[in-house]
Amino acid sequence: KSIILAKKKLEIRLQGKLGDMLYLTKSSYGKINKKRVLSRNKKKKILIAAHSFCDAPHARGKGIFNDFYEWIIFIFELSEDSKFDWYIKCHPNFYEYFDDTVIILKELLKKYKNVKWIEPQTSNSQLIKEGIDLALTVDGSIGIEYPYFNIPVINASENNAHINYKFNYHPRNLNEYKNKINNFYKLKQKIKNNEIFECYFMNFLYFKNNWFFSSFDKVINYHGGNFT
């Protein structure tokens, strides 16, 4: 029953509906735009799923990088001498955040020109359809979502919600991380959907939202939809 419920809930999320992540007010899986986003070429395409710089970078524990900013700088530097197409996208909720992540990223892209900016409102469904080959995150929920479409995800921290499962890659150090990115197309990963559903259930359905607050919904609404 748990697997069936998780499958249903995950598929609802991937249809662009909000639900199990109550702190979000916008979905990353909205309508597909007719205008193409990814370049039409034969290069492998990598998506950098950016984190808000202030959004609890140490909440789960230490990662390969000290924070989300250092992670971004490393990835941008890696893109400078690369045979891949690189893209970066923020969550659509970023425009409602109170930090300057979007501003800082756009300023950095003036220097790192191999990375292309994708508007946050662009649907992940569109990127998947157009042919993203790899997604990068530190510990984000894209690690559950993209593998469902057989797209590999490489995390930049072993302290992530998917660590006990094999549908993500979990490098242990910087050298391994760099090597996995540069050679991701050689990696052979057999994704089992039931593992994805189990992980989704344990992360988003097993624990009640009101375990800390008497009403989590009221807290989120009080803060205008933001929790960080």
Regions found by a protein language model. Give the residues of each.
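A donor-sugar binding/catalytic signature common to diverse glycosyltransferases
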Residues: 120-168
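Nucleotide-activated donor-binding/catalytic signature segment of Leloir-type glycosyltransferases, i.e.
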Residues: 102-119
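Conserved catalytic-core segment of nucleotide-activated headgroup transferases in glycan assembly
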Residues: 11-106
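Short acidic-hydrophobic, aromatic-tinged amphipathic segments that line or gate anion-handling sites
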Residues: 116-119, 168-180
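Structured mid-domain segments that build the active-site/substrate or prosthetic-cofactor binding neighborhood
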Residues: 77, 116, 123
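C-terminal amphipathic helix plus adjacent low-complexity
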Residues: 1-42, 174-228
